[in-house]
C-alpha cells in the first residue's frame, strides 16, 4: 500500500504564530494536518503523546505525523 503522502514533520511555534497560547485542541493542528501530534519539544524537555489540553508556547517544536502537503502548508501559515 502506498503511504508516500504520510510524513513526520515538525512545526515551530514562534513569536508571530497564531497558535501560541492556544491548546493543541484549539490550534486544530490535528484537523489541519489529518494527523497526530506525537510529541512536543520544549527546551530540553520532550513530551511524548501530549494531552490535547497542552498549551503551546513560543519556541515549542510540535512533531506531527500526517498528510505531507497539509503539514507543509501549515508550516507556512504558522
Spans of model-derived segments:
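Long, charged amphipathic helices and adjacent flexible linkers at domain junctions
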Residues: 1-11
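Cytosolic Rossmann-like ligand/nucleotide-binding regulatory domains
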Residues: 10, 14-78
